[in-house]
Amino acid sequence: MFGAVGAALYAVLGLFSFLIPGTQSVAVRPAFALVPFFGKRFGVITGFFVGLVGNVIIDLISGYGLLYWNWSVANGLIGALAALIFTAIPPIAGEAVRLVVTAIGALAATAAGLLFVITDMWVQQGVDFSTFFYVNYLPALLANGIAVVILVPALDAAWEPLAKRAGL
């Protein structure tokens, strides 16, 4: 259930984005922060589902279709990796430290998951390693990295008291 809610939120809010000039359709998408957040809070399957399905819906609505399917898989991997990273980290009592660790973990999941888009070298014609790295990966990491470092800790700080009250 949380996966469907997360994917729907990501799909709707993800439409509010803008393309970075000089890249191959890399967009600044603040809603992307929902992917590692749902991974952290609800687990591997939910994180993967939110990233994959949410990104597929965004691409379909935006008119890209399934042309960039590998980016959807990368988004799913980011949600799953966030879940794995935060599962490996023991509970942190201090609020400030927990939020810093949340930002670092979300950024690490984003950096690792986006590496899957190296498949652009085989999926799209004319993409070599240099193009992948400088035109696709780094701009996406920068845009999404800023979003996750700021918004995932903010979402987590807002969610923590609600989760405790609800017994989650």
Regions found by a protein language model. Give the residues of each.
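Transmembrane-helix signature of polytopic, membrane-embedded enzymes
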Residues: 45-53
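Hydrophobic/aromatic residues in alpha-helical transmembrane segments
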Residues: 34, 77, 81, 115-116, ...
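Residue-level recognition of pore/gate-forming positions within transmembrane alpha-helices
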Residues: 7-11, 55, 75, 110
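Helix-adjacent hinge/juxtasegments
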Residues: 55-92
